[in-house]
Curated annotation (Swiss-Prot):
GO terms for biological process: acetate metabolic process; acetyl-CoA biosynthetic process. This is Acetate kinase. ATP binds at residues 16, 204-208, 279-281, 327-331. Keywords: ATP-binding, Cytoplasm, Kinase, Magnesium, Metal-binding, Nucleotide-binding, Transferase. HAMAP family: Acetate_kinase. GO terms for molecular function: acetate kinase activity; ATP binding; magnesium ion binding. Mg(2+) binds at residues 9, 381. It comes from Chromobacterium violaceum (strain ATCC 12472 / DSM 30191 / JCM 1249 / CCUG 213 / NBRC 12614 / NCIMB 9131 / NCTC 9757 / MK). It comes from the Bacteria. Mg(2+). Can also accept Mn(2+). The keyword Amino-acid biosynthesis does not apply. Pathway: Metabolic intermediate biosynthesis; acetyl-CoA biosynthesis; acetyl-CoA from acetate: step 1/2.
Length: 397
């Protein structure tokens, strides 16, 4: 292999990576370092069908990066790495596209910590570690938020005093932008249309879930807001909720802001509604056996999603297709059916057999021939990051 891009996604206690072949766009090696900060921190590598896990020499990001370098050296892949791409959750309004990393860019990412206090500090740690280990290689940041920077003011502003936007950056930002960009391009190919003439509603459904309106290839609206808490029902996040809940729970239960925020982020969503699990697969199995909480959670999830598909159609302007992606979107034929069956008034008619076939990596159309298309598309954020990195590093063909 002549050339590859190392893609890094750094969390507070984890470091996920993928080595992407520049020519084939295939992942040659992937891995995950987890439990960073704990004594049993370990790293798992997947390469050529083999899976190996080893304890790290120290429980930190630097040790994880050293382990990746050693592994790449062992299998003679280290010299193929020509650039490094970093996933960064929040780029604020400054980063409207991916960016080559220098000290100025890193400082701007640090300024966005207030908008993503759980994510951006870890990204900066990963970036600085990678620069130290690979000082001669170009490094690129690819932002979850940048795709959504094309939203018009009417979509991103909250109806609060404008000084809060001007002075405190209070607005809708959105997440999952790298996934949306990849999936929007793939959807246009499946529909046989140019991307800049394609209007879609795309639902990225995983433990974190969001939905976006794409108008002629650009983001026109999205469900996540200032933070990833707004919008759809998620695994453990509530999604949309009346802000007065904070005052109500403070009075009724003596809860403070931090405990309410924690509850809405970590104890709500599918988990809170079902009182069983945040895992969609477990809930579908339990619901099939008659578990009332599981049935309730899935029903609320599907209704909220269907409602959002309808409202996002306004942002899209027209509906060339509805697209499902992410772990749940790509694999839950049950939830896709529950959503589409509520959207007949938008011209969607489910093809049950096609829907059942689109699981475990199978993409395709899941609606009838005379219906507005609904598509299942497998996202590939790592490839999108690698392609951006190659382009900005001057390595693209």
């Amino acid at each position: 292999m002549n050339s590859s891009i190392l893609v890094i996604n750094c969390g507070s206690s984890s470091l996920k990576f993928a080595l992407i072949d520049s020519a084939s766009h295939e992942a040659v090696m992937t891995g995950l370092a987890e439990k960073l900060g704990l004594a049993d921190a370990c790293i798992t590598f997947k390469h050529n069908g083999d899976k190996q896990t080893a304890l790290l020499s120290a429980p930190d990001h630097a040790a994880a990066m050293h382990a990746i370098i050693e592994k790449l050296q062992q299998v003679s892949l280290l010299d193929s790495v020509k650039a490094i791409g970093h996933r960064v959750v929040h780029g604020g309004e400054h980063f409207k596209q991916s960016a080559l990393l220098d000290e100025t860019a890193i400082n701007e990412i640090e300024r966005c910590i207030k908008l993503a206090p759980l994510h951006n500090p870890a990204h900066i740690l990963g970036i600085r570690t990678a620069i130290k280990e690979f000082p001669s290689l170009p490094q690129v940041a690819v932002f979850d938020t940048s795709f959504h920077q094309t939203m018009p003011e009417k979509a991103y502003l909250y109806a609060v005093p404008m000084k809060l936007y001007r002075e405190n950056s209070l607005r809708r930002y959105g997440m999952h932008g790298t996934s949306y960009r990849f999936v929007a391009e793939e959807a246009a190919k499946m529909l046989g249309k140019p991307a800049n003439e394609t209007s879609l509603v795309i639902a990225h459904l995983g433990n974190g879930a969001s939905i976006s309106a794409i108008r002629n290839g650009k983001c026109a609206d999205t469900s996540m807001g200032l933070t990833p808490l707004e919008g759809l029902v998620m695994g453990t996040r509530s999604g949309d909720i009346d802000p007065s809940v904070f005052g109500y729970l403070a009075t009724e239960r003596g809860m403070d802001i931090q405990s309410i925020t924690n509850m809405l982020n970590k104890e709500s969503g599918l988990l809170g509604l079902s009182e069983l699990s945040n895992d969609c697969r477990e809930l579908e199995e339990a619901a099939a056996k008659g578990h009332e909480g599981a049935k309730r959670a899935l029903e609320v999830f599907a209704y909220r999603l269907a409602k959002y598909v309808a409202s996002m159609s306004v942002g899209a302007g027209r509906l060339d297709a509805v697209v499902f992606t992410g772990g749940i979107g790509e694999n839950s034929s049950f939830l896709r059916a529950e959503v589409i069956n509520q959207l007949g008034f938008l011209g969607l008619k489910l093809d049950a057999a096609a829907n059942e076939a689109c699981i475990r990596g199978n993409a395709g159309r899941i609606t009838a021939a005379d219906s507005v298309p609904a598509l299942v598309i497998n996202t590939n954020e790592e490839l999108m990051i690698a392609m951006d990195t190659a382009k900005l590093a001057g390595l693209a063909n």
